[in-house]
C-alpha cells in the first residue's frame, strides 16, 4: 500500500573492527534488513578503538557506541577472578573469558536503550566465545534473539571472509600472509591461528606485541613490591594506584622483563583442543604475588579447599557461566577467605621469570618461633608422639587385620 513506511528492526552488534565483525554489518543488512547498531566495549584495546567509529559507519552501521568499561572490567571481573586464584588448566589466566560476559552485559543494556529485538556477535561456531556471549545474554535478557552469523552463512574460512570484505570495500587488519586471530584487553593479548595451529611450531619473537622476548630482556633483574588489601592489589612500589593504572603499570614492568608468555593447547568447551599463545604480563605478576600472600595468611584447610574452588571457578568462567548461581555462591566463599589476605609481596622479574623475593602481612600465621631449627622456640617435640599415634591409628588397625587374616 502506498505511503506505508516500515521501520527496520534493530540489532545490536558486538563490534571490534576486526575481520569477523567488519563483514557482519553488511551481512546483517543484506540478509535480514536490520538496522545495525554497533557496540564497542573498551576493556583496554588501546589504539585499536581509534578508527572504529568511522569504520563502523562506513561498513553500514547506523550508529556506534564506544563504551569505556575499563574500570568496571578490572574491578568487577578481573579482581574477583584473581581473588579466586582461578587458572584454567593450570596455565590460562582467562583474559578473553571474563571479558565476554561484560560485553554481553553491554549488548543487553544498549538493546534495551535502543529498543532492539536482537543482538549479534562475530564468534565462530568452533570457539568458546559464542557460548560465553549467548549465555550472558540468556542470563540477563532471555527475550532477546541472538544471531551468530558464523553458524549461518556460507563463509567457511578467514580467506573467504577477507574476500567478502574486499568485495565490499571494507578494510580489515588481517592479511593472508599473517592470518592470526588476536584479542586484546587490559589483561592480555591472545594469538591464535596461522602457523600456531601446528603445536610443533614455536612462536617467533615477531609474534609478541607487548612482551619483550625473554632473551632480549635486561641482564639485571627488576624488583617490584605490591600491596594487597583483602586480596585486592592497591599499590605498586608503595604508590597507591587506581585499578586500571595499577594493571597498566604492572603490564609495563613485566613486559619489559619478558614476563607473562603462556603457550597452551587447551581443551575448548565445544569439544576440541586449540592452541593459543597469550601475553599476560601484569596478570602473571599479580597471580604470583596474590598466591604468595595466601601462603602466609591462609590456614591449611582453607587453602586446600580453596584450590578446589579455584579450579571450578576457572571452569565456570571459561565456560561462560559468569552470571550463574554457582559462581555467585563461590564468590561469597572466596570473599570470606580474603579477609586476612592483606600485606606486601616483593617479586624479582628477570628474563621471563617472576620469582617471590619476600612477603609480609599483619595477619601472617607463619610463626618463626614454632618452626625454628635453632635452640628454644615454643614447640615441644614430645607432643608429636601422641599426634602420630592417633593420626596413624587407621593404618595400624588395617595392618593388624591383614596380618590376622593372612592378607599380607
UniProtKB/Swiss-Prot annotation:
GO terms for biological process, alphabetical: argininosuccinate metabolic process; L-arginine biosynthetic process; urea cycle
One protein family per Pfam: Arginosuc_synth
Gene3D superfamilies: Argininosuccinate synthetase, chain A, domain 2, HUPs, Single helix bin
GO molecular function: argininosuccinate synthase activity; ATP binding
Subcellular location, record wording: Cytoplasm
Keyword Membrane listed: no
Protein name per UniProt: Argininosuccinate synthase
Amino acid at each position: 500500500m502506498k505511503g506505508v513506511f516500515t521501520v527496520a528492526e534493530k540489532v545490536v552488534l558486538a563490534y571490534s573492527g576486526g575481520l569477523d565483525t567488519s563483514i557482519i554489518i553488511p551481512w546483517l543488512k543484506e540478509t535480514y534488513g536490520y538496522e545495525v547498531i554497533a557496540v564497542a566495549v573498551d576493556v583496554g584495546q588501546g589504539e585499536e578503538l581509534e578508527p572504529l567509529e568511522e569504520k563502523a559507519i562506513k561498513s553500514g552501521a547506523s550508529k556506534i557506541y564506544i563504551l569505556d568499561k575499563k574500570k568496571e572490567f578490572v574491578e568487577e571481573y578481573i579482581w574477583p577472578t584473581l581473588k579466586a586464584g582461578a587458572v584454567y588448566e593450570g596455565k590460562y589466566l582467562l583474559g578473553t573469558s571474563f571479558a565476554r560476559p561484560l560485553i554481553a552485559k553491554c549488548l543487553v543494556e544498549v538493546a534495551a536503550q535502543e529498543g532492539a529485538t536482537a543482538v549479534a556477535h562475530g564468534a565462530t561456531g568452533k570457539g568458546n566465545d559464542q557460548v560465553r556471549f549467548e549465555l550472558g545474554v540468556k542470563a540477563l535478557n532471555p527475550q532477546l534473539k541472538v544471531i551468530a552469523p558464523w553458524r549461518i552463512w556460507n563463509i567457511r574460512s578467514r580467506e573467504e571472509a577477507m574476500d567478502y570484505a574486499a568485495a565490499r570495500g571494507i578494510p580489515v587488519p588481517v592479511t593472508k600472509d599473517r592470518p592470526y586471530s588476536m584479542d586484546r584487553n587490559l589483561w592480555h593479548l591472545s594469538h591464535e591461528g596461522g602457523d600456531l595451529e601446528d603445536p610443533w611450531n614455536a612462536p617467533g619473537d615477531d609474534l609478541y606485541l607487548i612482551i619483550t622476548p625473554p632473551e632480549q630482556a635486561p641482564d639485571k633483574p627488576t624488583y617490584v613490591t605490591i600491596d594487597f588489601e583483602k586480596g585486592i592489589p592497591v599499590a605498586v612500589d608503595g604508590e597507591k594506584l587506581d585499578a586500571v593504572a595499577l594493571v597498566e603499570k604492572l603490564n609495563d614492568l613485566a613486559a619489559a622483563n619478558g614476563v607473562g608468555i603462556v603457550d597452551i593447547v587447551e581443551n575448548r568447551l565445544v569439544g576440541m583442543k586449540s592452541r593459543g599463545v597469550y601475553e599476560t604480563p601484569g596478570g602473571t605478576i599479580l597471580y604470583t604475588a596474590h598466591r604468595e600472600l595466601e601462603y602466609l595468611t591462609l590456614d591449611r584447610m582453607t587453602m586446600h579447599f580453596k584450590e578446589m574452588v579455584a579450579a571450578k571457578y576457572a571452569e565456570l568462567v571459561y565456560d561462560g557461566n559468569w552470571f550463574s548461581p554457582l559462581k555467585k555462591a563461590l564468590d561469597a566463599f572466596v570473599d570470606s577467605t580474603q579477609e586476612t589476605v592483606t600485606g606486601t609481596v616483593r617479586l624479582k622479574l628477570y628474563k621471563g621469570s617472576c620469582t617471590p623475593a619476600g612477603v609480609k602481612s599483619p595477619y601472617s600465621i607463619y610463626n618463626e618461633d614454632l618452626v625454628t631449627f635453632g635452640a628454644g622456640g615454643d614447640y615441644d617435640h614430645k607432643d608429636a608422639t601422641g599426634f602420630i599415634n592417633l593420626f596413624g591409628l587407621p593404618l595400624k588397625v588395617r595392618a593388624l587385620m591383614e596380618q590376622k587374616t593372612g592378607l599380607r
